[in-house]
Each structure stands twice: as C-alpha cells, then as structure tokens.
C-alpha cells in the first residue's frame, strides 16, 4: 500500500543510506543523498501504463500520487490525491542543476531528462534488481513492481466544527 510516493533507483538508495546512518535530520539526509549521488548509476527499465510501453535508461522511476517528498522536493507538480490516477516520473538523467531546479523552483522539468506519464495501472521490470522504497520506508531490492490506483480506498473522517450542524 502506497499513499504518497514510491520509487526505484536513486531516491530509494538515498533512503537505504539514510537508514544506515546514525545521524538523523536534514544533515543526515543530505549526507545520504550526497553518498548516493556519488555512487549513482542508471538502470534499464521497461514499464507499461494503461496506454503505452516504454523502455529506457533511468536514474530513478517514481510512482507518485502526491506532489512532494517529505524533504520538500516537489517531484510531481501535477499530482492530485483525488484524481483517480497516479503519475509515473521517469528520471532519465540527474544533474546537479536539475536537482537544484526541482528543489528550489517551480520551473518545468527538462523533458530530455525527466518525463511524466499518468496512469491507473503500471507494471515495471528492470534487468537487474534495484533499490525500492514506499512512503519513505526502504523495501529492499526488486526487479518487478505492479501498481494500481484503488479509487476511494481511504475514507477520512474529521470532527464537525462548532459552526456545522450535526
């Protein structure tokens, strides 16, 4: 079950490195991200959405229902929790400038480096096992992922305010 964001590749490796560090907080996360960046590599992924099949080299593939990671990085500007689709963000290549742009601006992604697809169902396969995380929890290495949106799966109950009739 994923409510927010899941991914394979670079960020999942950052989550693993962060879990392994004794240091917590943003400095610990920055250290893990730097270590992962220095050891980054690409993976060959094939993914199939409702409408197309794509094979590509990728640094990371994100399955996103929400818009941003807990660190504030807005990886999915198009995300809406209630639109009955999720976005697949294919990060083909990372550069320091693209990471800074994503983190500190609202400028659009460079389409040569990052593409976004909308879908209700997705299957991903990789040639080699890759790091995988779901909602900030490291799940290990995988070579296959299947995902689908489940409409209205979660009901949120909030208390009535003093101004609302009961």
What are these regions (language model features)?
Residues 1-166:
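Long C-terminal subdomains/extensions of small-metabolite kinases
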């Amino acid at each position: 079950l994923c409510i927010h964001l899941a991914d394979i590749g670079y960020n999942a490796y950052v989550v693993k490195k962060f879990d392994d560090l004794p240091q917590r907080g943003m400095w610990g996360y920055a250290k893990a991200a730097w270590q992962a960046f220095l050891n980054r590599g690409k993976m060959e992924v094939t993914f199939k959405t409702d409408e197309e099949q794509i094979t590509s080299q990728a640094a990371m593939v994100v399955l996103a229902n929400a818009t941003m990671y807990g660190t504030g990085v807005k990886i999915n500007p198009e995300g809406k929790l209630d639109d009955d689709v999720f976005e697949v963000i294919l990060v083909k290549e990372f550069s320091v400038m693209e990471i800074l742009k994503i983190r500190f601006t609202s400028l659009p992604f460079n389409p040569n480096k990052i593409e976004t697809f909308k879908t209700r169902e997705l299957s991903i396969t990789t040639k080699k096992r890759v790091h995988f995380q779901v909602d900030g929890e490291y799940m290990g290495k995988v070579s296959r992922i299947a995902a689908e949106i489940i409409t209205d799966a979660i009901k949120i109950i909030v208390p009535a305010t003093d101004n609302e009739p009961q």
